[in-house]
């Protein structure tokens, strides 16, 4: 009888672990399932043609296209020297895009949305995947000319 009870406890433990693993593995799908993109944000996301996984990640962050005051409230921790048009808040797993309506900057909302989604995707990587990606990115970055636009703009950001 004792052996049956031990096996039953093990089975219950195994089922609980399986459920937790499933919930963790599909957390983005659960968060994204009921989120509906509306208005301009829907058009922006449609125009950038994300993969299925990228679309799920984006929707899981419940992205918001915000006007100036709301955006500044959501993204209050940026430097005054850097123009911030989007913000992925890792602590909240939320994505915010400043609603730039300027004919002088065509596509800026699309580029910003895709860029911030990449921050969210990076946040979801396992530590060993981040280490590999960081290494690859550093190798490419180190090959850039010293006066490249990317190097110049990266100097505005804090080292991580």
Language model features by range: what are they?
Residues 93-96, 118:
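Glycine-rich, often proline-containing surface loops adjacent to acidic residues and nearby aromatics
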Residues 1-6:
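N-terminal Lys/Arg-rich, disordered targeting/topogenic segments
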Residues 111-123:
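Active-site recognition of the HExxH zinc-binding catalytic motif
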Residues 96-112:
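Short pre-active-site segment immediately N-terminal to the catalytic Zn-binding motif
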Residues 127-131:
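Surface-exposed, polar/charged faces of alpha-helical domains
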Residues 28, 41-42, 101, 106, ...:
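Generic preference for well-ordered secondary structure
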Residues 122-125, 144:
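A generic secondary-structure signal for well-formed alpha-helical elements
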Residues 9-27, 33-91, 132-160:
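Metalloprotease/metallohydrolase-associated module, dominated by Zn2+-dependent proteases
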